[in-house]
Structure formats: structure tokens, C-alpha cells
């Protein structure tokens, strides 16, 4: 049987440099030895035939994490390894006695260069079996990657992170799913989207790898037929996908449900929503002035994603209200138009505040339209406190707002009050609530502690087709 020893070390490590005499003893011993240096081919100086591993290929292939590492091979198969310095382990593995008698009995090693941040992914791309399926675009030496992304139409108007192989590989480590798995066909052009393509766009959006499960869930939710993504992309209305995230994942990845929850400044909120929009654009072909014919659009079509505040034990989270068990991480996708301010600094009872909110909600789309579009009501902590102090929870708030939003059809029909817009004249004798009771109004909690201000996010007028256009809630896996 062929026996062999391998040593991998680096000069920039006190433990490695301490073992100069040990390397010389191994090199003169009966078992052949290969000594690799990660950072300096002239080290160790006590050995004449050091192997240059500054490319780190050998370190990568031997999966080195700590240097120095000593490995014993028999017929090319690894029989054992030790790392750092421990005299007994080195003597046992090498078969030599009295190694490093003047040295301490043991000393910890140092981190290997091949596992330094950013290096591992580069080595996997260079020497591993990565095999990306997506087409690679080679840039010239003087090409600016940021400008190249703009020129190829891959951006939403803001700079994107160039999707290098290393960044894509790092992003894929955020999920256990096969990169080649088909997630779905993305409207409007129905391009095939794999997990790998999701990772590419997540890189471009600025996501961290730990956001990948949320991005994947949001994408899968958007492809559920009831969400009607194709229609949403083709409408001339304002709407785009709005993502509400619930459950433990919001805390795990640092999402914002507090101060400025609907605004800028939080990486997870901003980039998860942006990743979905980039996938729609780059894989599905949903680009403005092409299939996207929105008259005005809204700023949320760059990104609109936030977490619900679940810190109050008395409050039923949106995910639970929509049928999921407490503690389940979910995404809810809604056809959102943008934020409409609701200011009420005078109401002091829950009944009064609910009526006030209903008045504001009646303006969604148009004050004379009913059961025409859906909405989200984001209740701020100060407004919620008025409800909570009176013992009101989700059920009581929803019931009071729906009841207060009911209006006589004679005031809403086309032509009433001197305004042509309105509901079907056949409904003149009906009394109609503003929203469908089952999914027309989604109520969530979010926002900073100060301010008697809540928010209304109006919805797509396609919501009038209640059987085929609905918000959807989907579990994150």
C-alpha cells in the first residue's frame, strides 16, 4: 500500500511558522510528504520542494479549514487528519516519534485562506462542479458592470449589484432547493424561472442569502392563479405586488415592522420586494411601456414589502386570520397602489375611530365605488392602543369598519350627487359595504410608537372580480 503525508500551511500563521523543524523531519522521514504553502512558496524554508498553493486549489480540494493541517493518505484515500499543533496527534498520524521536542505540547492553528470571506465561493466556481445553467455574459476589461446592466435592460432604473458567479453561488446557499428546480413560468411572457434565476435577480436586488426563502415564497405566491399576476402586469391602473411578511422569519432576517415600516432604510424590506419585481421584469418581461402599460404607476413598483408587527399578544396576525397556524412564516401578496395617509388625532373611542377609518377607506378608488377594489389598512400603535384599551381585537375592528362603510345605493349610483362615476343604477335600492367581507379589507399592525397616523393601501380595481382576483397568503418553506 502506498502511504503519503500532506501538510498545508501558510507563513501568515504563528503556529505554522513554529513548525519549521517538524516539516524538515517529516520531509526526511520514510513516508513521502507533500508540503503546500497557501501564501508564500518560499515557506517553509526548512523544506526544498514546497508546492505553491497560492491558487488555493489543493486547499479547496482537501477541504482545509485550519492551518497547519496534516493528512495521511493510503492508496490515495484519506485515513486521518489533524489540524493545529498537538504533538501526540502529529506523531501518531506520521508514525514518527519525538517531533518538535522543544515546542509546546499543543497550540491552536489559524483560519485557512481558502475559507476567508468571498474566497470559498470563488474557489467553488473555479474548481468545483457548479455548472450554472443560465447564460453567462462576458464583459470587456474596460466595461463598467453597473453600466452594462443598464444597457442590457436588467434594471428597474436604479443600479443593480452585478450578478457574478461568486455572488450567485453565495445566494444559492440561502436555500436547500436545487438550483435547476423550475419555480414557475413568469408572466407576461411566461419565461421559465429556476431557483438559479431567482438567485441571480436576488443578487441584483441586493438581497442577502438568508432572504432567499422569502423571495421564493413571494414568487410562488404571485404565480397562484387567484393572484392574477398577468392581469396585474398588463393593467393601466397603479397597482403592483405588495408583500406582507408574517412569522418568525421577519425577526430572523431583521425585517422592519416599526418606525418607517412602509418606507426606506431596511435592507430586507427593500430588497425582497425589489427581487420579485426584477424577476417579473427580467424573466417574465414585465417592462414599462411594453406589456406594463400603467398610466402612472406607483413608487411601490420598485419594491413594496414590509413585516407585520406581531409583538402584541392580543392581536391576531394577518397570517392566522387567513388560516395559518400561529408561528408559521408566511407571505401575503396584495395588488397595492401606494400609501394613502389616514390622520385622526381626535377620536378617543374605538367606535369613533372605526367610523373615521371607514370614511377614509370609502375613498379608495372613488368614493362612489363599492365592492370594486380591495385595500389594506395598516393600523399604527397609537391608533391600535385605542382599540386595545377597549378590549377590541381584529374581529371587532373588522366588524365595526365594515358596518360603518355601508352606504345606500342611491348615493352611489352613476350620476348621483352630480357625479357620473358610480355603481350600477340597478343597485339604487341596495345598501352596499365598501369591500367584500371575506378578503376585501386586510388589516395589519405596523409603525412607530409615536403618531396618530395609520395608512391605507388601495388595491387594483380588478378586485371587483372577486372570484378570480384575490390576495393570496403562502407559507415560507
Residue ranges and their predicted role:
Residues 124-477:
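Non-transmembrane, aqueous-exposed alpha-helical and coiled segments at domain scale
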Residues 100-133, 140:
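Iron-sulfur (Fe-S) cluster-binding modules
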Residues 61-63:
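Short loop/turn motifs at secondary-structure junctions and domain boundaries
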Residues 65-66, 71-107:
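Non-catalytic, surface beta->alpha helical segment in thiol-disulfide oxidoreductase systems
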Residues 30-55:
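Thiol-based oxidoreductase modules, predominantly thioredoxin-like and allied folds used
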Amino acid at each position: 500500500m502506498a502511504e503519503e503525508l500532506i501538510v498545508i500551511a501558510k507563513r501568515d500563521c504563528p503556529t505554522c511558522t513554529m513548525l519549521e523543524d517538524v516539516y524538515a523531519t517529516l520531509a526526511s522521514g520514510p513516508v513521502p510528504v507533500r508540503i503546500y504553502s497557501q501564501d508564500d512558496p518560499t515557506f517553509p524554508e526548512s523544506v526544498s520542494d514546497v508546492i505553491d498553493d497560492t491558487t488555493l486549489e489543493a486547499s479547496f480540494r482537501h477541504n482545509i479549514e485550519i492551518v497547519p493541517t496534516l493528512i495521511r493518505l493510503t492508496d490515495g484515500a484519506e485515513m486521518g487528519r489533524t489540524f493545529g499543533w498537538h504533538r501526540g496527534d502529529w506523531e501518531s498520524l506520521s508514525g514518527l516519534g519525538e517531533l518538535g521536542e522543544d515546542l509546546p505540547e499543543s497550540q491552536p492553528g489559524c483560519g485557512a485562506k481558502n475559507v476567508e470571506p468571498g474566497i470559498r465561493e470563488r474557489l467553488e466556481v473555479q474548481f468545483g462542479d457548479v455548472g450554472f445553467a443560465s447564460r453567462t455574459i462576458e464583459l470587456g476589461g474596460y466595461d463598467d458592470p453597473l453600466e452594462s446592466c443598464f444597457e442590457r435592460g436588467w434594471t428597474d432604473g436604479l443600479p443593480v449589484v452585478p450578478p457574478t458567479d461568486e455572488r450567485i453561488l453565495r445566494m444559492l446557499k440561502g436555500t436547500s432547493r436545487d438550483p435547476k428546480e423550475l419555480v414557475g413560468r413568469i408572466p407576461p411572457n411566461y419565461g421559465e424561472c429556476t431557483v438559479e434565476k431567482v438567485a441571480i435577480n436576488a443578487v441584483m436586488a441586493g438581497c442577502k442569502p438568508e432572504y432567499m426563502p422569502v423571495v421564493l415564497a413571494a414568487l410562488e405566491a404571485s404565480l397562484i392563479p387567484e393572484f392574477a399576476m398577468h392581469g396585474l402586469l398588463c393593467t393601466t391602473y397603479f397597482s403592483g405586488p405588495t408583500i406582507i411578511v408574517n412569522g418568525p422569519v421577519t425577526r430572523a432576517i431583521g425585517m422592519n415592522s416599526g418606525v418607517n415600516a412602509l418606507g426606506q432604510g431596511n435592507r430586507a424590506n427593500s430588497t425582497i420586494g425589489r427581487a420579485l419585481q426584477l424577476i417579473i421584469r427580467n424573466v417574465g418581461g414585465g417592462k414599462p411601456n411594453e406589456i406594463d402599460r400603467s398610466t402612472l404607476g406607483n413608487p411601490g413598483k420598485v419594491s413594496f414589502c414590509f413585516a407585520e408587527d406581531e409583538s402584541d399578544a392580543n392581536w391576531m396576525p394577518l397570517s392566522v386570520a387567513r388560516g395559518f397556524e400561529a408561528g408559521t412564516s408566511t407571505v401575503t401578496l396584495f395588488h397595492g397602489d401606494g400609501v394613502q395617509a389616514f390622520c385622526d388625532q381626535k377620536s378617543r373611542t374605538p367606535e369613533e375611530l372605526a367610523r373615521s377609518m371607514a370614511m377614509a377607506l370609502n375613498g379608495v378608488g372613488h368614493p362612489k365605488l363599492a365592492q370594486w377594489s380591495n385595500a389594506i389598512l395598516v393600523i399604527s400603535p397609537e391608533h391600535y392602543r385605542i382599540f386595545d384599551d377597549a378590549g377590541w381585537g381584529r374581529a371587532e375592528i373588522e366588524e365595526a369598519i365594515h358596518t360603518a362603510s355601508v352606504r345606500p345605493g342611491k348615493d352611489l349610483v352613476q350620476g348621483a350627487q352630480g357625479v357620473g362615476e358610480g355603481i350600477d343604477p340597478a343597485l339604487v335600492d341596495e345598501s352596499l359595504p365598501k369591500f367584500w367581507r371575506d378578503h376585501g379589507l386586510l388589516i395589519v399592525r405596523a409603525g412607530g410608537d409615536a403618531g396618530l397616523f395609520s395608512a391605507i393601501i388601495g388595491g387594483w380595481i380588478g378586485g371587483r372580480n372577486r372570484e378570480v382576483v384575490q390576495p393570496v397568503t403562502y407559507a415560507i418553506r
